[in-house]
Structure formats: C-alpha cells, structure tokens
From Swiss-Prot:
Cytoplasmic topological segments: 1-155, 283-336, 396-410, 493-545
Residues of this chain annotated as glycosylated in UniProt: 440
PANTHER family assigned to the protein according to its UniProt record, in alphabetical order: POTASSIUM VOLTAGE-GATED CHANNEL SUBFAMILY V MEMBER 2, VOLTAGE-GATED POTASSIUM CHANNEL
Name of the protein described by the UniProt record: Potassium voltage-gated channel subfamily V member 2
Species this chain originates from: Homo sapiens (Human)
Region (Disordered): 74-93
Lineage: Eukaryota, Metazoa, Chordata, Craniata, Vertebrata
Key word Magnesium present: no
Topological region Extracellular: 177-261, 358-374, 432-444, 466-471
GO biological process: action potential; potassium ion transmembrane transport; protein homooligomerization
Summary of the function given for this chain in its UniProt record: Potassium channel subunit. Modulates channel activity by shifting the threshold and the half-maximal activation to more negative values.
Protein's membrane topology: Multi-pass membrane protein
GO molecular function per UniProt: potassium channel regulator activity; voltage-gated potassium channel activity
Record remark on domains: The segment S4 is probably the voltage-sensor and is characterized by a series of positively charged amino acids at every third position.
Listed GO CC annotations: membrane; plasma membrane; voltage-gated potassium channel complex
Length: 545
C-alpha cells in the first residue's frame, strides 16, 4: 500500500443540509476536470506508452438488481436525513459540482456528471450516494475541511481509471502487471463494455502467459523439493518425531550423511539389479551356486543377486510408506508408483511359480500350465521398469517426464499424425503392390510396418515397393515423415531445456538449504584435525587451525 497524505484527518460525520441536497439536484452539467492547485499534485496527462483497450462483458442481472436496491436504500436514508433542519452554513453549489479524491498522494477533481454516467463503479456510487455513512464506507479516509476522499491505491493504475472517466475508454499500459491491474480494476469497479473486443487480445495473451508461467513454476518447485507438512508430523500420535527423522532420511539425501549414503546405495542397487537382469539371460553366466543340505540349488547366482536387490527395494518402499505424513499424497506420487511397479512383478512371479508347481503335482492340463508360463514371461518383462527408479535421483529424467506432462497435447497430435500417415500410405502402397509377384505387401496390416519405418526415416530395407507408383508413394511417405518429425521436436526440446535449467536451479537452492544444517567439508576438516591431533598430541591450537 502507498502511504496516505499527511493532511488526512480522522473521520467526522457532518449531516447534509437542505441547501446541499438542493445544490446536488441543480449541479452544473459541464464536465470540468482538472487538478487542484496549492500543495496537491496536478493532474497528469495521459501517460505515454503502449496501450491496449480492455473489455470485460458487463454482468447484468444480479449486479443490476443489487445496484437498484442500494440506490433505493440510499434514497430512503436521504429522505430521513433531510427531514431534520441542519445547523451551520451551507456549501456553495459551485463546490458540489466536483468530487475531490486523493489516490496515493495525488489529488484529482472529478465532475459529478462524468461519475454519474458510470454508477456501478466505486467513484460513481460515491458520487450518487446520498448517505454519508455509505460514502465513508467506499473510501479509506475523509477530510472534512477540504471535502476530500482518500484512497490507498496505486496512483499509476488510477491514472488510467481517471482517463476512463474522461473519455469512456480504458487504456491498458503494457508495463503493468496483469494480475495487479485486474485487482485494481476490481476495486474501482470499472466494467468497460463499450470498447471493441478485438483490442482485448493482447492483454489476455499476457495474462494467460503469466498464469501459465506461475503454474509451471509452482509445479517445478514441487518437483524439486519434497513438501512436508510440519503440523502433520507434530500431530502424529504414533512415533511422530521418529517418523519425521526417518522421512528426512529417505526423502532428503542432503539432510545428513546417512541420508546421502542411502541415496547412493539406492542408485547402486538399481544399476546392479539391471545388470543382473541382463546377464541372467546369458547362458554362460547361468552357473549354479552349488548344492546345499536340501538338495541342488537350481537358481543361478545372478538370481540371488537380483533377490538381494529386490529385498533392498522392498525395505526402502516399506520405510517410505511407514514414514509418510500423508498416505493420499504418497499414493498419488509417480515416483512411489514406479517403486511399486519395480518390486511387484517379482512377488507375482514367485506366487505364480508356487501355483505352477502345485499344478504339476496335481496333474493339471498342459494348456493351463502354458498360460501360466506366458503370464510368467510377462512378469519377467515387467522387471525392466525398475530402471525408472533412477528418476528419483536423476534431474534429467524428472525434467523429461515433466516435459511430457506439460506437452501432452503436442505429443498427442504428433502420435495422431503418425497414425494417420501410417494408415494412409500403407493403404496406398498396398493398392499398387499387392498384385506384384512375391511381394511383401500382402495385406494392409503387413504394410503398416513399412509405413512406420518410412515415416520415422529409419528405412530397414526389408520391405520396399517395386512399381513406379509405389515408389512415388514411398517418397511422399518419407517426405511426410521428415516434415512431421521436424515440427514438434524443436518445441519439445526448447521446453525440455527450459524446464531442466529451472528444475536444476530449484534443486540447487533446496540442496543449499538442506546443507545449511550439515556442512560436509567442515565436518571432513574437523575429522582430519581430530586424526592429526590424536597422532601428534603436542600440536598447539594454532597448528591445529
């Protein structure tokens, strides 16, 4: 808020006399607007700059009825006031032709006839109101000696509002904040319904762009830092402080040395499990671990390594689940869903293997066992999703996922165009190639693979048209793929670069704040000094430093 003028006084109620009411009914129709002389600031001219007209559809109906009810109430109160004979001299009618306002230290004189033309605005209601209490409720302060109304608002925006009362057109300065400008317009009650709507486009574009940037900034901050509710940990009935320390240990890797060690161990186990999953398919690496007391162990060594990794992932997930302050937020988190998908296939596979073993003992049909085997292969395939656990420790992966969420419309359009191209060109090539002897374009579904490879500009060469018309369609398909791949990639890359840099900056700020409590370099120097002091106790304090 701007400071009010030093000449402001406390509110003082003064009843209006009959002369004032009569003078208000015979106001001059001239619209004399000008600045007051003396210590007050003069009226500024229209500010130079880039302006845009702004329109907002007038909301009739409830607002119109409310305005009529207010006027009826004010007329009734005015009739009660005029019944009493006022005391003291009356003001000249000439002084009642203008309304004196002071906005942020700048004084203005507005003609009553201009304000009465916009009775729904704040100054219009102030000018047309006959109740002093109603007038005082519309302003911040009132000075009786100079008959001046004070408002603690932005004078730069009111200059545009003042020009609106003068010309009937609101000019929007491009340098103003859209949200701040709309807030000021809401306070003054300016509706602006007589300006062409086409001039509103520039202002709406800036407003929408600002809203989108603020939304993205909020989501990026939420991605960069773990939102924890202090009151939730404080109000927990069961082991609140212990769960808070465990939460910091699992979710904030830079809050302590132990948390950093757990983060490094988690990334290491992810890489080891992925390597073990890949090497487990190599026949030379499938060596048995030996024989135990219960008989030969048929599981390879790499499967034992994978089981160890899955045990760590399970323990990590359970600790996060036990320490979370909000189960709903935990369930909605994408990273926690990835953790669950990473460990769930192994337990489903073990469960199905148990049922499969019982089925063999009971002599079930081969068909049912074969179906279970297919399900087991799908479960094994789902284990590759555990590599997505690296997104918890990788800024680039999280920025890539955030980019896909923000650009889902562009990605959807890209997939739609690719599908349309595949269906169109595969049907076209099939129509001219299916009669060729020993052709690979036997059906349209068989042609989909060729169209997909051609649109992606890969070109394996396993399928190719032989007729001249088919080659012409192939050229069109490749050209369509080049144009299609070039349009959205630049947009996605620019947004990914922007989101990655912002997310990296927010993460750096969060890490610096978390490291404020734990200074690893200072702790390392302290440990080295303690070791040196233990090996040579004759060191002086100066030598220790």
């Amino acid at each position: 808020m701007l400071k009010q003028s030093e000449r402001r006084r406390s509110w003082s109620y003064r009843p209006w006399n009959t002369t004032e009411n009569e003078g208000s009914q015979h106001r001059r129709s001239i619209c004399s607007l000008g600045a007051r002389s003396g210590s007050q600031a003069s009226i500024h001219g229209w500010t130079e700059g880039n302006y845009n007209y702004y329109i907002e559809e007038d909301e009739d109906g409830e607002e119109e009825d409310q305005w009529k009810d207010d006027l009826a109430e004010e007329d009734q109160q005015a009739g009660e006031v005029t019944t009493a004979k006022p005391e003291g001299p009356s003001d000249p009618p000439a002084l009642l032709s203008t309304l004196n306002v002071n906005v942020g230290g700048h004084s203005y004189q507005l003609d009553y006839c201009e304000l009465a033309g916009f009775p729904k605005t704040r100054l219009g209601r102030l000018a047309t109101s006959t109740s002093r209490s109603r007038q005082l409720s519309l302003c911040d302060d009132y000075e009786e000696q100079t008959d001046e109304y004070f408002f603690d608002r932005d004078p730069a925006v009111f200059q545009l509002v003042y020009n609106f009362y003068l010309s009937g057109v609101l000019l929007v300065l491009d340098g103003l904040c859209p949200r701040r400008f709309l807030e000021e317009l809401g306070y003054w009650g300016v509706r602006l319904k007589y300006t062409p709507r086409c001039c509103r486009i520039c202002f709406e574009e800036r407003r929408d762009e600002l809203s989108e940037r603020l939304k993205i900034q909020h989501e990026l901050r939420a991605q960069a830092q773990v939102e924890e509710a202090e009151e939730l940990f404080r109000d927990m009935r069961f082991y609140g402080p212990q769960r808070r320390r465990l939460w910091n240990l699992m979710e904030k890797p830079f809050s302590s040395v132990a948390a950093k060690a757990i983060g490094v161990a988690s990334s290491t186990f992810v890489l080891v499990s992925v390597v073990a999953l890949a090497l487990n398919t190599v026949e030379e690496m499938q060596q048995h671990s030996g024989q135990g007391e219960g008989g030969p162990d048929l599981r390879p060594i790499l499967e034992h390594v994978e089981m160890l990794c899955m045990g760590f992932f399970t323990l990590e997930y359970l600790l996060r689940l036990a320490s979370t302050p909000d189960l709903r937020r935990f369930a909605r988190s994408a990273l926690n869903l990835v953790d669950l998908v990473a460990i769930l296939p192994l337990y489903l596979q073990l469960l199905l293997e148990c049922f499969t073993g019982e089925g063999h003992q009971r002599g079930q049909t081969v068909g049912s066992v074969g179906k279970v085997g297919q399900v087991l292969r799908v479960m094994r395939l789902m284990r590759i999703f555990r590599i997505l656990k690296l997104a918890r420790h990788s800024t680039g992966l999280r920025a890539f996922g955030f980019t896909l969420r923000q650009c889902y419309q562009q990605v959807g359009c890209l997939l739609l165009f690719i599908a349309m191209g595949i269906f169109t060109f595969s049907a076209a090539v099939y129509s001219v190639e299916h009669d060729v002897p020993s052709t690979n374009f036997t059906t349209i579904p068989h042609s989909w693979w060729w169209a997909a490879v051609s649109i992606s500009t890969v070109g394996y060469g396993d399928m190719y048209p032989e007729t001249h018309l088919g080659r012409f369609f192939a050229f069109l398909c490749i050209a369509f793929g080049i144009i299609l791949n070039g349009m959205p990639i630049s947009i996605l890359y620019n947004k990914f670069s922007d989101y990655y840099s912002k997310l990296k900056a927010y993460e750096y700020t969060t890490i610096r704040r978390e490291r404020g409590e734990v200074n690893f370099m200072q702790r390392a120097r302290k440990k080295i000094a303690e070791c040196l002091l233990g090996s040579n106790p004759q060191l002086t304090p100066r030598q220790e430093n």
